[in-house]
């Protein structure tokens, strides 16, 4: 095979790999089929001191806390579930819109990652993951989705 033909083959191979790499950058892993835990499971999570569990809950805002501005900024508030259990919600406002009109007494629905602590726990990752490595979370307040 002549040198120009070999060179042309190499160019096509490199071009093919470049296309594969480009197309692969659009690949998103299949969503995990593990259903999230729900408020009915929260007592079990607390009892077993489990953490890093995706959970979806509904509750009433009982207290608005000051924002945590150390590192990534987080809006914080406490919700009470129908069972009486309270959870701290930690919402990253560098990655998701702030919920400006939230008030004590408002109903919210939250999907995020539960972390156990001795006060009942907290939910964070209530936002999208720009790197697509973690399940996207959200907060629904007054028919608006914050993620």
Identify the residue ranges that each predicted region occupies:
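OB-fold and OB-like single-stranded nucleic-acid-recognition modules
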Residues: 4-147
